Amino acid sequence: MITHASFGQDVKGYIKDAESKEALAGVNVFYKDKGGTRGTVSDINGYYELKVTDGDAVLTFSYLGYETLSVPVKVDPGEFLTHDVSLRTNSNMMDEVVVSVGRYEQKLSDITVSMELLKAKDITRQSPKDLTDVLKNISGVDVTDRQPSVRGGTGWTYGVGSRCLILVDGMSVLTPGSGEINWNMIPMENVDQVEVLKGASSVLYGSSALNGLIHVKTKRPGLDPVTQVNVQGGLYGKPRQDGTPLYGGLDLSHSRRIKNFDLTVGANTFLDDGYRQDNYNRRVRVGGNLTYHDPRVQGLNYGVNVNYLYNDYTGFFIWRSPEEPYIQSPLANMGRRENTFYIDPFLNYTNSEKGTTHRFKGRFFHRGSRIITHTTDKSLFDITNNMGFDISSVPEIINMAQNWQTELLPTFLPYLPEVMNGKVSGLMAELGKLGNHFFPTATSADYMDLISWVMGRTPLPDKNNVGAWLVDAMKPMEKKAPEATDHTYSYNLDYQFSKKFEHSQLTVGGTYERIHADSKVTGQHSSDNVATFLQYDHKFIDRLNVSVGVRLEYYRVDDFYREAETKIFGAKVPVKPVFRGGLNYELGEYSFIRASFGQGYRYPSVTEKFILKDIGGVGAFPNAELKAEQGYNAELGFKQGYKFGNLKGFIDVAGFYTRYKDMIEFRFGLFNNKTFDYIDGLSKLFNAFSSGDGLGIGAQFTNVGRAEIYGVDLSTSGVYEFNRDTRLAYTLGYVYTNPIDMDVDSRNAEEEANDDLMAMRSKSNDSKYLKYRQKHSVKGVFDLEWKQFNIGTNMSWKSKTLAVDYFMVDERTKAEPNLMDYMRSMLFGNLHDYWAENNKGYFVMDMRVGMKVTKNVHVQGLVNNLLNKRYSARPMDVGAPRTFILQVGANF
């Protein structure tokens, strides 16, 4: 739209979005004359003013994500023109604007790596409880136990330490110290778009971006105030349990401009009973942004982001038994009550004439956390009664204990030669008879209750307190919270400078982060992280984009560890250099080929290195020798836009290769409670008991050696316009990954040579594959809109899990069970047969139907896991059953 006031030498006006009528700040307005190109940019209110030489000129209005508009004008001396311009968003998906790749705005078609993009409308339709509900529908992205993995880069780490960095407006939401992702901190009520970058991103963003990057961009206020309210309620179906667990949430957000201020505030409350017993999540979060655009200096703004979260939740580690998969094992029940707060001051200055931008960011972070654990709620009487124990058997037990040489030794001694030869079936059969004699109805879950009860009642009684101990033993166990609160503090500074040239962009910057953790989980530890980075992007012949970058990083934990270390001319330097490079070439109209190479690394978090805690009976054990993992990612990709009548979209195919050194993985098994040694032999087992150190069940982070992951990522997105009122949007993706343990042959040979009765293996089979990965994944999202109605579906199929921990499952064929088989049966029930029957791949489908009741109010009903499939990506963790959701939202 153009309006003419009169003619003259000055041209001015306002620039708005053609649909929303919101002012567009930062629009490039320019024209060419004999002296070159002259131009300006619009301010926060969309206002521009430009001096134009006499005569004819063509004004060009250019803004990323919008169609470029050219307007011819005729200028007479001594007069002026007013041009109010409305720009339309670019309907081409490949012209979408992203910022994650180069820390500045680029077209999706110009970037040199693979990226997926989700807009706010796509996210709201999913009615997510948090961002994980959205990410699981993206091709190449998996979420296991709330831990994201891009193209098989991560297995199962129980949420601690992440190879995928999560950002909100450029700042990390990984919890300092532990490296876990706090999904509850992400303001879902105010998300504008989510960018998922596939591949190493350590050059610009540092550690934890080894496998990829997920960047959440929040909305900014327009000219008119906007208030959004969203209410949702969910009802879990009944898989095989009593009761009907519920969840519900409320989102509120408000944004507006007040003179030179931008104000955004948001709040969320969420209560989830969980579909598994004692697996709940309760949160309250409030936050906001205040930005001041200084009228005295064009391009200068500064302000602050604030966020506070109260969270009370429990995790789910392992089940009670295959018959009770939605009930936690009494040995694995842990929760947290947390108060998390951060404040992020910032300052941005852009000089449009010089093409330079300065960005300063800071953060103060604090988390107070209390771990809540309990073993079993049952009393000793309850447990033994369930096991069929007869109180009249007590004298018999006492007699056996006092006269074990005559009562027990003759029964078990004959099996000693078999045991020495590695056969334990006869001995275990006799022990089974003895157990069945006293506990005729006992199950594996009952034995776990008994073990859990004993762990919760230690120390055992002596002759002076037997009576009091027995009275207390008849009482059920209760949840206990530690007296002390764990505290984690973080201080962060980030500076970025960018210079835009005619055909290139230079970005340089530096970061500093200080973390201090005072915790019962890890003890007291501090870390320092200092880095500087540089990236240069250049466009050649209007078709070729080339990008190169480097990062230097220093990291230290306490005073004794330098995780980032490099040899230069034989000398060790406490700095880790990381390089990346990429190119994108436009073959033809909407046809692009790209190639990229990026190094990455990730130093272990304080928690991974020093963790020592009980997960309600199951422990987590430290590994002070844990080293930083490093690797690189290479990719060759092709993107092609297409248009056939009313159908338009693009197809993207990429081949990728990732290699790791000193890869950090989660090892589950038995450990010495004091030395933290991994128990992989009878001698270590006996030493743990004879020394009084004790034995623990749990996990430890360890470096597993070399690994490589390669495959193909194929996806397509598009829209078919049936008519003015009807359209179908779709996204389809297939990913093939081949996750290889490069040291598998030597490791298998070493493990095969160990004939100890307690010999442990690294994983559940002798295959070449890494643990907790799948080879094939197919995902699809479809949404049909007709007038004010919409109907949509998500579909996902994944092939079987290739390998898991040996301590959980042994898939090898044996002539007879070994000692570990009997131990697994007692701990986890008949998990072997359950896993063999159910680990065959799975298909999950969600459905949704919605309607716009009025212009500002919409209602939507959803059914997740429509077919009520029971599925698992890892043993003893069953996915949610069929879930019914109602969502009501309003904008005004």
Provide a role label for each language-model segment:
Residues 115, 132-171, 175:
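Extracytoplasmic beta-strand/coil segments of soluble accessory domains associated
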